[in-house]
Amino acid sequence: SKLFNQRYKNVFSGDSKWKAVKAPKGLTYNWDKNSTYVQHPPFFQNMNDDKKEVNNIEKARVLAIFGDSVTTDHISPAGSIKSDGPAGAYLRNNKVKNNEFNSFGARRGNHEVMMRGTFSNIRIKNEMLSNIEGGYTIHYPSNKQLSIYDAAMKYKKYNTPLVIFAGIDYGM
C-alpha cells in the first residue's frame, strides 16, 4: 500500500554505521545451527499437498488432566526459563549461562526451547498429581514423576499416542 511504500522506500539508506553492518546475503534466511534463539523448524519439512489419513487414537496414555481456564500462557509460557527445567537443561547443554537464559518469549524462534517449555508454567496444575504445581506428570508404566516434556519424549520413543484432558476455556 501507499503507507508501506512510503515508510520503507529508504530502508536500505542510512549513515556509515548502518551501512557497515554485516549481514548475510541471499534470497532466503541462512539458518545458524548454533543459535539458541532462532532455529529452522522441522515442522514443514517433507510436507506436501497429499491429504493425510486421520486415524483413530487407540491405546493412548494420558499426559495431563487440567481443570478449567488453562490459558495460552499455561500452555506456551512467555515468562522466565527455569534453570532446573527441560528448557534450562537444553540451554545449558548449548553453553548458555543461567543468567543469559532470557525468557520463553524471547526464544520463541527456537522450537527446541519452546517444546521443552510447553505446559511448563509454574502455576499449571496437572490433576494427575497431588499438591504439585508446574509442568509435571506421571509416566506410566514406570509411575515416575517427570516433567511433561520428558514424559512425552519417553512416550514418543515407543510410539505411544498421548491425550490431554482439559476443562472449559482451554487456551483462552
Protein language model features and the residues they cover:
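Fe-S-dependent hydro-lyases/dehydratases of central metabolism
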Residues: 1-172
